[in-house]
């Protein structure tokens, strides 16, 4: 039997951060990781650059958490984005802030974040154990450790930091949900979040595959609801199956059960122009070359890859001379550019999602300490909890803030 002050399942962002904080407080800590590699998911976040947080206030982080944001109030009050930045700079990682207040290592290399966390763990006496957690060890209603494939590990504090189900090749297999259920915790429905979407118009999207649009707006609507669910300016990407990119990923966090309702994504390709201003711009372009075919007249206005789609949607003969286009046809063109609508069929599989929506029901977790309300000595931190946010470093902030609250309570 091996005993520690704290034992943590999962060597991801939350698990290693919590281990460092406990080690700094003089606790003996073991981190159990079955994948044989620390921080595997961290290595691929931010396209391999690792968007560690967002350089904003705690209130702004709260606004970027679409569900259960109140649960995070205490944790964010105690460990805000500025604290995350100070932590990594203290470990020798230089940081920079980019567009949208996204914070990255100056090196643009996620490995530097992982190496810093691993070294901080080792320097504070944390032991990494290559083993697979099978079940919790419970005695008299209290968590006492983990029963693993190659042995049992006991501790005064037992911490589940196993992540969600996204990117399972990195070790995120959803084991934490099974552990939570074993002691009576409710686990809300697990679905993809921050995930590309498949559209019914995928054949229209395919020719534009690879096209990245900047400074467009995306509005997400649900059928039979007057008020939009989501509206934001940013970037998006056309794929062979539909839509992706930051705007689409953030909008996906608001998608519900697509068997019960239909969702639409409206893209405004020229949000800086009103309908009247766009019409004037088109008239000017048409006037410059009045004898051009319509299909050859939109190059100044739109990226070439999307022009065939716009022509098809607005229903204007592509070979029609622009000096013959009627006002009604021009209005259809303006409306199409200002509201290019796609119908969401489904999200891509959870394996392709950046994070998981759903998890351990936070109503059964103490928001000040992340301790289970059902089982003393048991804690849940990071993505295993039913809290998720938009892109921009907010999800890693959740991981670090929940881990800090846990360590602060134990330490």
Q: What kind of region is each of these model predictions?
A:
Residues 4-31, 406-410:
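N-terminal Rossmann-like FAD-binding beta1-loop-alpha1 element of flavoenzymes
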Residues 7-9, 32, 133, 146, ...:
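Short hydrophobic core segments
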Residues 157-203:
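Glycine-rich loop(s) and the adjacent beta-strand/alpha-helix scaffold that form part
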Residues 49-97:
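Glycine-rich active-site loop/strand segments that organize a redox cofactor
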Residues 23-47:
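Glycine-rich FAD pyrophosphate-binding loop
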Residues 36-38, 43-44, 58-59, 94, ...:
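An anion/pyrophosphate-binding glycine-rich loop and adjacent beta-alpha core
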Residues 129-142:
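A conserved short coil-to-beta-strand element within the FAD-binding core of flavoproteins
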Residues 129-132, 308-388:
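A glycine-rich dinucleotide-binding beta-alpha-beta segment and adjacent secondary-structure elements
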């Amino acid at each position: 039997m091996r005993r520690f002050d704290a034992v943590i399942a999962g060597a991801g962002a939350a698990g290693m951060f919590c281990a460092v904080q406990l080690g700094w407080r003089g606790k003996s800590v073991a981190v159990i990781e079955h994948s044989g590699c620390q921080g595997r998911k961290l290595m691929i976040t931010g396209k391999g650059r690792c968007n560690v947080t967002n350089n904003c206030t705690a209130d702004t982080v709260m606004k970027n958490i679409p569900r259960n944001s109140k649960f995070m109030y205490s944790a964010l009050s105690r460990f805000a984005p500025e604290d995350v930045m100070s932590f990594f700079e203290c470990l020798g990682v230089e940081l920079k802030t980019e567009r949208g207040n996204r914070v990255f290592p100056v090196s643009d290399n996620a490995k530097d974040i992982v190496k810093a966390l691993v070294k901080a763990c080792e320097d504070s006496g944390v032991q990494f154990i290559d083993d697979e957690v099978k079940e919790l060890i419970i005695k008299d209603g209290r968590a006492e450790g983990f029963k693993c494939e190659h042995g049992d590990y006991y501790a005064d504090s037992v911490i589940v930091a196993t992540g969600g189900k996204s990117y399972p090749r990195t070790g995120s297999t959803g084991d934490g949900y099974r552990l939570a259920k074993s002691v009576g915790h409710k686990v809300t429905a697990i679905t993809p979040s921050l995930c590309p979407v498949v559209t019914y118009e995928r054949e229209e999207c395919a020719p534009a595959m690879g096209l990245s649009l900047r400074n467009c707006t995306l509005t997400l609507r649900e059928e039979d609801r007057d008020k939009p669910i989501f509206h934001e300016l940013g970037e998006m990407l056309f794929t062979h199956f539909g839509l992706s990119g930051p705007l689409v990923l953030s909008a996906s966090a608001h998608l519900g059960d697509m068997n019960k309702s239909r969702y639409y994504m409206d893209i405004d390709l020229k949000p800086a122009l009103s309908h009247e201003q766009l019409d004037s711009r088109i008239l000017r372009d048409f006037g410059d070359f009045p004898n051009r075919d319509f299909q050859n007249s939109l190059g100044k206005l739109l990226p070439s890859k999307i022009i065939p789609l716009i022509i098809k949607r607005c229903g204007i003969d592509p070979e029609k001379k622009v000096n013959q286009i009627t006002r009604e046809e021009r209005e259809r063109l303006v409306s199409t550019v200002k509201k290019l609508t796609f119908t969401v069929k489904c999200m891509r599989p959870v394996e392709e999602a950046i994070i998981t929506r759903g998890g351990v029901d936070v109503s059964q977790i103490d928001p000040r300490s992340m301790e289970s309300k059902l089982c003393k000595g048991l804690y849940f931190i990071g993505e295993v909890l039913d809290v998720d946010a938009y892109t921009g470093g907010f999800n890693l902030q959740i991981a670090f803030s929940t881990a800090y609250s846990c360590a602060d309570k134990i330490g």
